[in-house]
């Protein structure tokens, strides 16, 4: 993934690290995660760490999740892919965000259709 990202140009800096043990020396205005959190054993712990240690005051976390209970089309993914995936309900993800210390927490579904419940998007801000 890093090689692919670097080959697309730009001036980004990419590195490989364990998300659960990584300690950032910097804080950030915006952190975005897409299709990551449900692979973690304890996403609540990671989101709390991001809220407390990685975001600047006024910084925002935005997370996109396609594998969640209300999205029935995603229920077979774990078996098809052969990788453990955490299946939570929308309200459970919302509670994780609210209990992490983030404020102004919002959520919505993006790109829903007849056969797809949509990407669950959650966001919150550090005060």
Per-segment meaning from a language model:
Residues 5-6:
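Conserved SAM-binding loop
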Residues 9-21:
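Conserved SAM-binding strand-loop segment of SAM-dependent methyltransferases
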Residues 32:
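A conserved beta-strand element that flanks and buttresses the S-adenosyl-L-methionine
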Residues 39-50:
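A short, conserved alpha-helix within the catalytic core of class I
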Residues 58-66:
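Conserved beta-strand signature within the Rossmann-like core of class I S-adenosyl-L-methionine
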Residues 65-85:
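Short, glycine-/aromatic-enriched active-site segment of Class I SAM-dependent methyltransferases
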Residues 84-101:
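Short alpha-helix
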Residues 100-102, 106-127:
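Core SAM-dependent methyltransferase catalytic element
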């Amino acid at each position: 993934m890093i090689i692919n990202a670097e080959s697309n140009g730009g001036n980004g800096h990419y590195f490989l690290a364990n998300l659960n043990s990584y300690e950032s020396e910097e804080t950030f205005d915006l952190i975005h995660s897409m299709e990551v959190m449900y692979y973690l054993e304890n996403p609540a712990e990671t989101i709390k760490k991001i809220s407390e240690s990685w975001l600047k005051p006024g910084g925002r976390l935005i997370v996109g999740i396609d594998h969640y209970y209300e999205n029935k089309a995603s229920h077979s993914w774990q078996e098809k892919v052969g990788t453990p995936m955490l299946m939570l309900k929308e309200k459970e993800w919302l509670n994780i965000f609210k209990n992490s210390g983030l404020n102004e927490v919002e959520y919505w579904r993006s790109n829903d259709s007849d056969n797809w419940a949509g990407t669950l998007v959650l966001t919150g801000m550090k005060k």
